[in-house]
């Protein structure tokens, strides 16, 4: 893919994000910032489309979140100038684990724990 093609894709994404926000009355966006590549790209796109002052991010950590992920997420926010906050969702995950253990009579397995974390992050962002 050429630079020109990549720029065209980027500009289309930027225009569509701005248009979607305008059409739905959203002046600001809230996104999850994990310290990974996907959320880094989304945050840069949002800043480019809306301006950093309209981008807000949450790093929703659990007991499994590495210090490196926290550092990278903070660096991404600082470099791009958007609002950023770390919140600990582990207490919510722990409550869900206890609830599920009561329902099913055993502790949740690894894949279930991963899904709980992903769903809690999604619920938090949709709230």
Segment roles from a protein language model:
Residues 1-32, 48-49:
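RNA-binding accessory domains that recognize and position tRNA/RNA substrates
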Residues 2-9, 65, 112-117:
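Conserved acidic
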Residues 12, 40-42, 91-95:
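Short, functional N-terminal and low-complexity linear motifs
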Residues 27-33, 37-74:
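ATP-dependent adenylation/pyrophosphate-handling site
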Residues 54, 59, 67-112, 116-118:
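A conserved beta-strand->alpha-helix junction
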């Amino acid at each position: 893919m050429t630079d020109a093609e990549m720029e065209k894709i980027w500009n289309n994404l930027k225009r569509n994000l701005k248009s979607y926000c305008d059409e739905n009355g959203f002046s600001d966006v809230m996104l999850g910032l994990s310290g990974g590549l996907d959320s880094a790209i989304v945050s840069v796109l949002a800043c480019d489309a809306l301006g950093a002052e309209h981008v807000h991010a949450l790093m929703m950590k659990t007991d499994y979140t590495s210090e490196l992920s926290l550092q990278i997420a903070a660096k991404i926010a600082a470099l791009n100038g958007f609002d950023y906050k770390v919140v600990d969702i582990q207490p919510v995950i722990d409550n869900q684990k206890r609830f599920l253990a009561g329902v099913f009579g055993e502790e949740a397995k690894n894949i279930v724990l991963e899904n709980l974390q992903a769903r809690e992050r999604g619920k938090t962002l949709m709230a």
